[in-house]
């Protein structure tokens, strides 16, 4: 049975309308645009911002969502990551709606590459944190780091990054472990570092919220 996502003509046109409405195609100023993305942009707007090619952006989205479906079908785990302050709530929302682990505060160096230490920290969080009389500031720091990871029992089968440049260290750890990387990929990033780039605007909440709802729909098999 073919499980690949297909977009009928009307659905495709609707998706293009949504891309325009939610400013998905709006990239960075040309001087901040990575030359690697020249082949996926269609030009510049009047303000001098790069504009993604809508067909290529849609194709990248379909490819990424198909991969997410594949991971889900195999009962795999996707770790959602977005440590930029304005992403805190949206990352938590996606994690809770998809019943997936997430990191929306700070990235603890070695979280993936030093998995034994990470798993011990998660175990500590689950078993002891609420019982220990830690100072409020220290307790909050630990809770912010591990709240979204409390159900993570093993290394994830893939990671999803909302802002590549804000979490570049995450990509390095994932690549060293051959963990597939899905990421919203703006015009100022290196596409070579990402296995499943979703070509689109990662600088604003509006397009990220749009992508997030599509991801949630994919998990609930409504796409």
Where are these regions (language model features)?
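Ribosome large-subunit tunnel/peptidyl-transferase-proximal elements
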Residues: 2-158, 163-223
């Amino acid at each position: 049975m073919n499980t690949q996502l297909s977009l009928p003509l009307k659905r495709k046109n609707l998706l293009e309308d949504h891309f325009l409405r939610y400013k998905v195609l709006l990239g960075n100023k040309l001087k901040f645009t990575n030359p690697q993305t020249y082949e996926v942009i269609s030009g510049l707007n009047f303000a001098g911002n790069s504009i993604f090619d809508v067909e290529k952006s849609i194709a990248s989205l379909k490819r990424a969502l198909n991969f997410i479906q594949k991971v889900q079908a195999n009962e795999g785990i996707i770790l959602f990551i977005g440590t930029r302050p304005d992403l805190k709530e949206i990352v938590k929302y996606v994690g809770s709606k998809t019943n997936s682990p997430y990191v929306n505060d700070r990235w603890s160096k070695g979280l993936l590459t030093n998995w034994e230490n990470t798993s011990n920290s998660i175990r500590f969080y689950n078993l002891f944190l609420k019982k220990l009389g830690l100072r409020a500031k220290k307790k909050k720091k630990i809770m912010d780091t591990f709240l979204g990871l409390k159900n993570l029992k093993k290394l994830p089968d893939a990671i999803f990054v909302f802002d590549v440049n804000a979490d570049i260290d995450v990509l390095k750890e994932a690549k060293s472990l051959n963990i597939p990387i899905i990421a919203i990929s703006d015009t100022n990033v290196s596409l070579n570092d990402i296995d499943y780039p979703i070509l689109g605007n990662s600088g604003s909440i509006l397009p990220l919220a749009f992508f997030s709802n599509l991801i949630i729909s994919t998990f609930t098999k409504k796409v």
